[in-house]
Amino acid sequence: MADPTVVELANQMAEECLAVQRETGQERLFMEVAAVLGASSQTMEEAFVTAIRTRLAAAQGGDFMAK
């Protein structure tokens, strides 16, 4: 399991990234951010991608249940 600080930072970055994606319409921005993170820290990249995926999955699940 990742260091709690890594998870916290990844969660913050995921929230910020998804907000920018909504504002700009760049649906794959998170992939570019993940690549930048991965160049420095594979651990941070994995935590960030996990944070993004869980948020996207939760949103899709919520949309499905709302139908």
What feature does the model see in each segment?
Residues 1-25:
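N-terminal acidic leader/helix
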Residues 20-66:
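Amphipathic, hydrophobic secondary-structure cores in small proteins
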